[in-house]
Amino acid sequence: MAFLLNNASISSHLRSSSSQKTGDALSISRRGFHIEPGTREKALLAEDSALKRFKSHKKSVHKLKRIGDVLTVVVVAGCCYEIYVKAVMKKEALAAGKSS
């Protein structure tokens, strides 16, 4: 019972303290306000012609990703085939050993 009274007093204290601070500018919005980027931020976000040659081109990147995906599928299929062949060979060897 003391725990419930303690919780009630804590919550009432928090409610009263938050109602007293409603005049503060910081308590109006916890997320803050949107501010426009300054000149330094705008300069950092602007395109730089010196870096343009390092920019990856969408078509070539898309092709490279596609080739990587195909190679991944081929490797996984090859591994699955190897496992299947080993299992079949083992099964045949056991069957041949039992029959002789």
Curated annotation (Swiss-Prot):
A molecular-function term among this protein's GO annotations: protein-membrane adaptor activity
UniProt membrane topology term: Peripheral membrane protein
Q: Where is the transit peptide?
A: 1-32
Give the GO terms filed under biological process for this record. tricarboxylic acid cycle
Its domain of life reads Eukaryota
Q: What is one GO cellular-component annotation here?
A: plastid
Q: Chief localization class?
A: mitochondrion
Compartment list: Mitochondrion inner membrane
Keyword list (alphabetical) reads: Membrane, Mitochondrion, Mitochondrion inner membrane, Transit peptide, Tricarboxylic acid cycle
Start-end of Low complexity biased regions: 9-19
Please state the pathway this protein functions in, per its UniProt record.
Answer: Carbohydrate metabolism; tricarboxylic acid cycle
Q: Where is this region: Disordered?
A: 1-25
Q: How does it assemble?
A: Component of complex II composed of eight subunits in plants: four classical SDH subunits SDH1, SDH2, SDH3 and SDH4 (a flavoprotein (FP), an iron-sulfur protein (IP), and a cytochrome b composed of a large and a small subunit.), as well as four subunits unknown in mitochondria from bacteria and heterotrophic eukaryotes.
Q: Which PANTHER family match?
A: SUCCINATE DEHYDROGENASE SUBUNIT 7A, MITOCHONDRIAL-RELATED
This chain belongs to which protein, by name? Succinate dehydrogenase subunit 7B, mitochondrial
